[in-house]
Amino acid sequence: MNGSKASKKRKAVTRDVEEEAGVFSGDELNTDNLDGALSDNANDLSSDEDESDSEVELIDDFSDEDDEEEEDVLDSDEIPSDGEDLAKKKSNTAPGELGAAMDDGESSSEGEQLNYRIEKDANGNDRFVYDEINPDDNSEYSDIEENANTIGDIPLSFYDQYPHIGYDINGKKILRPAKGEALDALLDSIEIPKGWTGLTDPSTGKPLELSQEELELLRKVQMNEIPEDGYNPYEPTVEWFTSQQEIMPLSAAPEPKRRFVPSKHEAKRVMKIVKAIREGRILPFKPPTEEDEEDDTIIKYDLWADEAERKDHPMHIPAPKLPPPGYEESYHPPPEYLPSQKERKAWEEADPEDRASEFLPNDFGSLRRVPGYENFVKEKFERCLDLYLAPRVRRSKLNIDPESLLPKLPSPEELKPFPTACATVFRGHKGRVRTLAVDPSGLLLATGGDDGTVRVWELLTGRQLWSVKLSEEDPVNVVRWRPGKDALILAAAAGDDIFLAVPPIVDPAIEKASLDILDAGWGYAASVPPPTPAEANKKNNPPKWMRPSSSLADLGVCAVIPLRYVAKSLSWHRRGDYFVTVCPGSSTPASVAIAIHTLSKHLTQYPFRRRIKGGGPPQAAHFHPSKPILFVANQRSIRAYDLSRQLLVKILQPGARWISSFDIHPTSSTASGGDNLIVGSYDRRLLWHDLELSQRPYKTLRYHRKAIRAVKFHPGGRYPLFADASDDGSLQIFHGSVTGDMLSNATIVPLKVLKGHKITGELGVLDVDWHPREPWCVSAGADGTCRLWM
């Protein structure tokens, strides 16, 4: 480049330049650190200028083009002699490397506008004059208005005699603004511009107007809003001191020794006091004064000086103590102890002998308001009368062993035989086994389960003899054998229907007799005239017995009774011609919930036209073993109806929340003195009722942890046994003997707990039945098995 361009004027630095500061050779240049290092931004220059405190401002162009020309302008008369080495080192830099760096700088600054202009100084050299910095939002410079008054804190009164009021940032005078006339002020007050305040700015002398930001701030303050944007007044509270009480030591320092070692200083002080007492300098007891000294001239007599202590009389009885005061004797008793106006009036009108207490409780509020007790002298006088006039008697305490008050029960070993172990397990049902029944001969066992099948097993061996599927969807809820050995008829309830079947596994003679009993009803049903149109239109007409389908008929099913509602209970009459069914569903009408079926006539009757009052829907029903009485149990009570007279005989109140089942003693009203029955409930209680004693239970037994599903007496009365089945997976065997003596009660003894069924789906043992001649019982469980207990 030519010398004219290279002769740029720079102001010299007032301090010496270090020799090695910022000088690198071309070989030492590391291109990895050049990212962002070359820049011609004015902000970089301004930051460098601010950091220098002891330097004269350098006004220069730091572009790559000027850096290339700096070598020629560093004369020896402009900078200290130490800078010559710096110029030499710069001249040793390779021209190619420096030119490449300058080319990169020029290319990077071509698209940006220069922030300076070149002028001539007094010597004719180029002078670079930079534009004024316009700070942005991120700059540290404050935005100063163009005509702002920069006089600072000088009062404006100093400029009253001058035509100007101050100076701007460039040092120019700010002239005093012209004042308007009164008409102009009136017009300004009428046409109020935006931001008008009516005040005068003391720094400029012009009317003070508010900016848009200030108006917005005033609006937020007036509307009770948050002035600052982005401020959240509902930030979560930082609990510097937590509100929860922390019970812990503030430090983990060990306990100091002075806490558990006697103090030496206190020991010294105590020893000083002890030494002073021994020397007589400190008297532990205050000597009596002259006033306290006794007067020897006064003669004193002791009335009991010669009185010898007399022993109590052998029959001496100490005086009884007064009872401690109660809440009603307090001067501020609780409100429930204060009498009402009615009680107070009744107490005042009653005779003193008839009053429950001799005073009325009063509330005085505080102890200082309590007056004197008017009956105090009277009570003390009566107390004295009681002490020396009333005879005293010693009461001897009865030393009775509580065990002797309990009835002596016989040992279970003396009450054998009863079932104690599992002998046979019956497996074959899919799902829960809901019901079972042992036939009158004691050879066969019928079961029904959730799979909709009825199975007949050989009792002793557990071999399945016969099976029929009655329903594809509904379970078999109950199966019962017809009483009597002359025929073998099985009744089963599955879904809405009752099925009567004769299993083809018995002798031909018994099978023929059973079929004859069932076929006799078809002839009677055919002879009955058809119902009239009025009777046919009734809602709850008795169902007609039907013949089964061909597939069921081939398997031994002989008749079907469509009840239209699900039956959960079925019980036969002792003669085998009647059986009663109960539909306990809540949607079942009350008039059809209980039905009595006649086997010889194929006839179904509904004895109840209305719902039984109290206790909810019916749950179970049984015939009396020797009387024409029907027992019907709902959720809370058991009612006995005389079928011959059609009257309600008795209502039993077991006190259970929900009755699950009940059974009548087989020898009721024959060998025993009255009727006895047992009741099982879902609230884990087993209740024994003696109808001759009371409507309430005679005994309540609570031995199970879960609901009781079934209870059963041993049939025939040969063995005084009964059992219950519970959801806890166990059976309880009891001894229950009754006698014909009206003065003696039933004897109930718990004998054995039988466990073997698994609890499945919160259900355990669902049904239980006894062998007709042996002390054996059979149980059905929710685990899909049946067990024979011997």
Curated annotation (Swiss-Prot):
One of its GO terms (biological process) is maturation of LSU-rRNA from tricistronic rRNA transcript (SSU-rRNA, 5.8S rRNA, LSU-rRNA). It is found in: Nucleus, Nucleolus; Nucleus, Nucleoplasm. PROSITE patterns: WD_REPEATS_1, WD_REPEATS_2, WD_REPEATS_REGION. It comes from the Eukaryota. Residues 321-337 have a biased composition (Pro residues). Residues 46-84, 133-143 have a biased composition (Acidic residues). WD repeats lie at residues 428-467, 471-511, 613-651, 654-699, 703-744, 760-790. HAMAP family: BOP1 (MF_03027). This is Ribosome biogenesis protein erb1.
